[in-house]
């Protein structure tokens, strides 16, 4: 359980899961492709401040990671240690009864004793396997919250619930605004030839946000989860797997085209939605249909096992009655790779001339007057000197103040010195002489509790003070800000509509 080198028998959360996570982080620009947070990505006053916000975001995760580890460890101890056997049994019985009431009310017993609840669960398993799968998943996913509700005292439980409500509200409001903005800015406006007036744009933005809220409510009301929550995140996030190809290749490859971008988005979405449907309908619909045709089932079994064979045990596909042979992370990876392939192939087929990247990114002759001039990073890297090369690799430029540089170097030292350094040391050490189990216990206690608590305490005080200061500054700037009506998100002739006067000025001076 604790030794990460002993994961060959794991089907879902193995080394391939980690590999896909690393690949997705690079491919997606460390979260830039997750459109649920695009409001944060686009809210900075300029590109430099956006870069600094991402640097600060690395320190923000210390306390969160520690809380996840602590609550999980507490729940595991409570449900497995002999000293809490009676209390844990009562918690499990109550949880199963609540899950039955949620998934299959007809099977929920009137008497919530252990024997009655267990018997009802067994009847559900025998009579409705598909619904039992949802029941079993919810029971597993709700174990930690159920344990916390039983062991926390009244006041502390109330504070914890209040914190969860605050987090849910901030997340849902951000997501509704982000997805509503995407519907208006990236779908409605490009298809509409006549631009919106500011009043129309705000009206339709509010309508879109309302539609997103209604959809989220209906989806949550009718959807039954059948897989781990992290796998659910992976497969639903894969709906926008094509966004990585659009952003990364669109910014760094001048032959990318709009047709290639649409194909990448459509291919990624189709694979994700198709995989999501297969995962949820496999037990109740898909597999029974396959079982009715033994020849088709045999062919699918042979084909699937032949494809995954070279990659076993990290990718292990087996056609079984209980679940779809691909998990959410594998579907996510397939969607990303397919989106990249679709973008490249279609762009090469439809590209007539290279796109002017300098014009779009304000480089060279297209640099704006309010932007600091600095040689590109690859030009800086050609200069001699270790510090110059390191500066180019880290992305530190003339926009960085002394405080910004201190923050950036602190993240570099933390990520490469502590994070990558300890990782590499532990890997080499264990390849030569594997650690005993107790050493892993000590290591995770130091890294996940001690170090994380220090980072969490420092960052909490730091962000509370700095966040309050920046919030007041933002309100002051908003009071003085005068909106540019042309800067409404439209793209004309390959650039933002707000940049057209600047381009016209350059053309007149040429």
Locations of regions flagged by a protein language model:
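Membrane-helix interfacial anchor on the cytosolic side
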Residues: 456-480
């Amino acid at each position: 359980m604790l030794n990460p080198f002993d994961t060959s028998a794991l089907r879902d959360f193995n080394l391939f899961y980690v590999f896909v996570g690393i690949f997705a982080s690079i491919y997606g620009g460390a979260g830039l492709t997750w459109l649920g947070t695009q409001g944060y990505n686009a809210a900075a006053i300029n590109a430099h401040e956006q870069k600094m916000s991402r640097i600060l975001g690395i320190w923000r995760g210390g306390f969160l990671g520690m809380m996840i580890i602590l609550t999980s460890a507490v729940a595991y101890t409570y449900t497995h240690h002999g000293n809490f056997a009676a209390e844990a049994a009562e918690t499990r019985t109550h949880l199963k009864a609540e899950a039955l009431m949620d998934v299959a009310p007809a099977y929920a017993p009137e008497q919530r004793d252990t024997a009655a609840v267990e018997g009802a669960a067994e009847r559900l398993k025998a009579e409705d396997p598909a619904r039992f799968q949802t029941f079993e998943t919810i029971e597993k996913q709700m174990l930690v919250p159920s344990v916390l509700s039983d062991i926390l005292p009244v006041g502390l439980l109330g504070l914890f619930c209040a914190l969860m409500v605050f987090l849910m509200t901030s997340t849902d409001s951000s997501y509704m605004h982000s997805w509503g903005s995407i519907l208006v800015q990236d779908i409605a406006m490009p298809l509409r030839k006549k631009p919106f007036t500011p009043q129309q744009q705000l009206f339709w933005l509010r309508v879109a946000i309302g539609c997103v809220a209604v959809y989220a409510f209906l989806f949550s009301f009718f959807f039954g989860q059948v897989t781990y929550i992290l796998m659910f995140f992976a497969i639903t996030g894969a709906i926008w797997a094509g966004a990585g190809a659009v952003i990364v290749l669109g910014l760094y490859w001048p032959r990318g085209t709009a047709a290639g971008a649409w194909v990448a988005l459509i291919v990624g979405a189709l694979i994700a939605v198709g995989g999501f449907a297969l995962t949820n309908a496999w037990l109740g619909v898909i597999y029974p249909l396959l079982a009715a045709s033994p020849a088709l089932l045999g062919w699918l079994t042979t084909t699937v096992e032949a494809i995954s064979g070279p990659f076993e045990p990290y990718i292990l596909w087996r056609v079984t009655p209980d679940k779809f042979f691909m998990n959410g992370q594998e579907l996510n990876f397939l969607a990303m790779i397919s989106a990249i392939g679709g973008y490249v192939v279609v762009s090469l087929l439809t590209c007539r001339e290279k796109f002017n990247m300098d014009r779009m990114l304000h480089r060279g002759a297209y640099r704006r007057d309010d932007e600091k001039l600095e040689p590109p990073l690859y030009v800086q890297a050609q200069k001699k000197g270790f510090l110059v090369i390191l500066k180019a690799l880290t992305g530190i430029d003339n926009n960085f103040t002394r405080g910004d540089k201190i923050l950036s170097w602190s993240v570099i030292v933390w990520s490469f010195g502590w994070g990558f350094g300890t990782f590499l040391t532990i890997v080499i050490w264990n390849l030569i002489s594997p650690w005993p189990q107790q050493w892993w216990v000590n290591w995770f206690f130091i890294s996940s509790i001690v170090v994380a608590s220090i980072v969490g305490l420092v960052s909490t005080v730091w962000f509370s003070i700095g966040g309050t200061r920046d919030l007041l500054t933002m309100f002051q700037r908003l009071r003085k800000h005068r909106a540019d009506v042309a800067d409404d998100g439209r793209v004309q002739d390959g650039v933002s509509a707000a940049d057209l006067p600047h381009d016209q000025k350059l053309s007149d001076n040429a």
